[in-house]
Amino acid sequence: MSITAAQVKELRELSGAGMMDCKAALMETNGDIETAVDWLRKKGMAKADKKAGRTAAEGLIGIASKGLSAVVVEVNSETDFVARNDAFQTIVRNVATAALDTEGSVESVSASIYPGSEKTVEEAIKDAIGTIGENMAFRRSAKLSVQNGAVATYIHNSVADGLGKLGVLVGIETTGDKEVAVDFARKVAMHIAATNPLALTVADVDASIVEREKAIFSDQARQSGKPENIIEKMVEGRIRKFYEEVVLLSQAFVMNPDVTVEASLKDAEKMIGAPAKITGFVRFALGEGVEKEEVDFAAEVAAAAKG
């Protein structure tokens, strides 16, 4: 089959492998990008990608909090120009505010009342599309609540209050000092923004992901020619390392890389004055997993000339 330069470029960006290696991988996997990444990894030519996903959508991430709950939403626009528009930013902020009084799903938020009006969120967004003159979409939403403690929030590279390109929520349960607890949880939120963990604990990691990693590590280890019992130990070691890379509590804390997030939490309990537990987190990066349509500029000009 014919492999395009665009496919090779995309695989290089995802895998960090060389151009010819990427081309060979695509030929071997009939042009399937995700399978090609695995093929390269088995050959030892690519790095592990914790969350492969093409990021291309414009828009904003919005965060709002109230009491023991916080929400994070993503609203997409077609261009970054509109995302910088005050009217669009107001919409994202109001969608986040509306989400606080729901259970957090896109469906429930869309059906809720848009702040300051009698319309639903869905209706308000449709009206805004007509006013702003550009398509927009309320793509996703999540809510995090605690029973006794706090939910810390963090926006990376904020463009306005509660708005940016990446947002994180972290729940922390404790009966101790809430201000100290939320300050620590916010540092954990900054850590999550930087490291993008897959799960809170080892038990939370999707079993299919672990099996996939084991298969890749086994293939890599067998290339060493070592006996099966040694290969088994090598794979166990690689899986332990994998958990240290993708599990929040097992990761080296960005604020103090000499200790894990879990150990840092134990340390923080002394200042909090009571046991504390991170109960969950949510991380939204703008456009995660969305592939933007690529426009052939020459074809677009030709079409315009014809018509």
Swiss-Prot record:
Q: Which Gene3D superfamilies match?
A: 1.10.286.20, DNA helicase RuvA subunit, C-terminal domain, Elongation factor Ts, dimerisation domain
Q: Where in the cell is it found?
A: Cytoplasm
Q: Which domain of life is it from?
A: Bacteria
Keyword Protein biosynthesis carried by entry:
yes
Gene Ontology molecular-function annotations: translation elongation factor activity
Which parts of this chain are annotated as the region Involved in Mg(2+) ion dislocation from EF-Tu?
79-82
Keyword annotations: Cytoplasm, Elongation factor, Protein biosynthesis
GO cellular component term, pick one = cytoplasm
Tell me yes or no: is Protein biosynthesis among this UniProt entry's keywords: yes
Homology family: Belongs to the EF-Ts family.
| Stated role | Associates with the EF-Tu.GDP complex and induces the exchange of GDP to GTP. It remains bound to the aminoacyl-tRNA.EF-Tu.GTP complex up to the GTP hydrolysis stage on the ribosome.
Entry-linked HAMAP family = EF_Ts
Under what name is this protein listed?
Elongation factor Ts
**What is the source species?**
Bartonella bacilliformis (strain ATCC 35685 / KC583 / Herrer 020/F12,63)
| Lineage, opening ranks | Bacteria, Pseudomonadati, Pseudomonadota, Alphaproteobacteria, Hyphomicrobiales
Q: Which gene encodes it?
A: tsf
